[in-house]
Structure formats: structure tokens, C-alpha cells
Regions:
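Short, well-formed alpha-helical segments that are part of the catalytic scaffolds
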Residues: 1-18, 201-214
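Acidic donor-binding segment of Leloir-type glycosyltransferases
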Residues: 23-46, 209-214
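Short phosphate-binding loop-to-helix
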Residues: 39-73
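Structured catalytic core of nucleotide-sugar glycosyltransferases
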Residues: 54, 88, 93-95, 188-214
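Short aromatic-hydrophobic micro-motifs that form the base-stacking/packing surface
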Residues: 75-77
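Conserved donor-nucleotide/metal-binding helix-loop-beta segment in metal-dependent transferases, i.e.
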Residues: 84-108
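Short, glycine-/small-residue-rich phosphate/pyrophosphate-handling segment
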Residues: 120-141
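Conserved alpha/beta core of the MobA/IspD/sugar-nucleotide pyrophosphorylase nucleotidyltransferase superfamily
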Residues: 137-189
Length: 214
């Protein structure tokens, strides 16, 4: 179920990128998963295996790879941000027209988006990824290198059951979430509970259990 949900995240994110004029690159791990990703996301994207010993190095190398292909700017996003929208991506590129680095913060103290015009590898190095200080530490590293910073809106990455429950709650108010691949999947997997009042009906309960759990 977790894998299917993450596939929905990827579909939604790729769909939003396709609404922008940007070329799309997918950096994946482990090696050997390219064919599955192509089936999921399409052949029009470009796929590269991730390189590096840790998350920071892999992200830095991905940005360096894309900029090395001759692009003026690169925006890197996480793969667990189903509420990411094309407008946010377009804003990130606009920010890079006047700033060296753009960051998109998450509610838990991390970031879901980072973009730059040159591969500033020091921004990625030595960070405790997965902790609540990543955004602050990355911001400090960029400033220490004398880089100017801009920002996009804060979003929630899907790291826990409470994050998913928050997404479900927002689905009630936002039609675009209900229509997304993630929203449709969550709508099909809503947990239900049934309360059956009984009194001294052991045999009835046993028969009911047999029907529910054959």
C-alpha cells in the first residue's frame, strides 16, 4: 500500500512539472528501477541513476549534472510532496532570476524544493537530513557562502500517518486534491469501522466473525 501511494505522489508531481516549460529529469535509486519508472511516468522524461554516498551528495550531484548539460537554472524537489503545484515551480524559477538559491520549506523543518543557477555543493554537505533543522542549516550554509536566498510557499511532505490525515482533511475543501492521483487513491482506501450492539449473543458474534474473517 505504501508503494502504491508513493507511485501516486510521483504521478502528481510529474503532472505538475509537465504544466511548466521546464525539462524534467528523474534521478532514481537503486539502479535497475528505470524501466518501472518509465512505465509509471512516461518516456518523455530523462532518467539518471543517483550518484553519491548520502542524500546530500546525491542531491548535489543531481543539480550539478543538470546544470552541466547547459541549463541556466535547476530546481530539485522531493518525491513525497503531492500538494506541489505548477504555480510553485514557476515561482521558483522566477525567484532564481534575481536570487542565487531558492528554497521551499516544509512544515517539519525540512525543505521540499531547492534550486540554483550554479552547483553550490557546500549547501548540501554535512546536513542532518531527516531532522527538523535541515532547512535552517541549509539556509545558514547558503548565507555563509554569500549566496542570496528566495523562497516559495511552505508545504507538507508525507512522512507520517498524521501527514496523510492532514491531506485527507484538506481534500474536503480542495477539489484539485480530490481529483489528483493521490486523492483518488486515498478516497478508495478510507478505513471504516462498524459497531454492532449485542447482548449475550456469543453464537451470533462467532458467526459474524467467520463471515468477516473467513
Amino acid at each position: 500500500e505504501c508503494a502504491r501511494l508513493h507511485c501516486c505522489f510521483l504521478k502528481d508531481i510529474a503532472g505538475e512539472f509537465r504544466k511548466t516549460p521546464a525539462d524534467i529529469f528523474v534521478f532514481f535509486t537503486p539502479e535497475g528501477k528505470k524501466e518501472r519508472l518509465v512505465r509509471l511516468l512516461g518516456e518523455d522524461l530523462r532518467y539518471f541513476a543517483q550518484e553519491g554516498k548520502d542524500l546530500g551528495e546525491r542531491m548535489g550531484n543531481a543539480v550539478k549534472k543538470v546544470l552541466g548539460l547547459g541549463y541556466d537554472a535547476c530546481v530539485l524537489t522531493g518525491s513525497d510532496i503531492p500538494e506541489l503545484r505548477a504555480e510553485t515551480l514557476k515561482l521558483a524559477f522566477r525567484v532564481l532570476e534575481c536570487k542565487d538559491v531558492v528554497l521551499g520549506p516544509t512544515a517539519d523543518g525540512g525543505y521540499y524544493l531547492i534550486g540554483m543557477k550554479r552547483p553550490h555543493m557546500g549547501v548540501f554537505e554535512g546536513k542532518a537530513y531527516g531532522t527538523g533543522s535541515v532547512f535552517q542549516d541549509t539556509e545558514a550554509a547558503a548565507k555563509q557562502e554569500g549566496l542570496s536566498l528566495g523562497y516559495t510557499e511552505m508545504l507538507t511532505d508525507m512522512d507520517s500517518v498524521s501527514d496523510l490525515n492532514g491531506y485527507r482533511a484538506r481534500m474536503k475543501e480542495r477539489e484539485e486534491l480530490r481529483r489528483s492521483a493521490t486523492g483518488r487513491y486515498l478516497a478508495r482506501t478510507v478505513p471504516i469501522s462498524v459497531i454492532i450492539p449485542v447482548y449475550n449473543e456469543a453464537e451470533t458474534i462467532e458467526r459474524l466473525q467467520e463471515q468477516l474473517f473467513p
